[in-house]
Amino acid sequence: MFIFTKEVALKPEICREVINQFEKSPHKNPGFISDSEGRILNDASKIKKSTDISLHPEQLSDPIWGDLLRTIVDTVYFGLRDYKIRYGQALYNLPDLEICQLINIQRYLPNEGFYEYHAENISDNNKERVLVWMIYLNDVTDGGETEFLFQRIFERPTEGKLVIWPADWTHFHRGIPSPTQTKYIITGWLSFKK
């Protein structure tokens, strides 16, 4: 299945601080998606509805996000190490990977989500993505799961849980809305080192 989970990979106090900084930030934007050519879709609200902040891994010296980003990046790399151990021989020849592109912090209010099934590397502008990672920042008990279509797995959001999975079409997934609760996540991708 190649879906790896690690409970409490990110400490609760770090999760709460990320949420706190997210809510205080003036840099929040409506979540967006792009088409297969990399063009941002103007009205994607029927596909995905969220509020996002995008951070670059290079922002490690940022006075607000720097320490938090370092902790998040370390958590992802420790998770990647455990992922490789878990799946051993299947990943024997997998080259070193690095966090690529953006790190996205996302807030889904009640009834918001990434409604449609999707994969993470099926267009020219994101084909370098090998694995997806996501950390749930809070518990959601009423819906809010990440559903993996072909694996028939529903991953429940619990504070600090790290999930890593292949970015390809084999792992179509979607974010199920919670009708009553807000969900916070951090997500990004791992790609081959350049």
Sequence positions of predicted segments:
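Fe(II)/2-oxoglutarate oxygenase catalytic core
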Residues: M1-L162, T170-K194
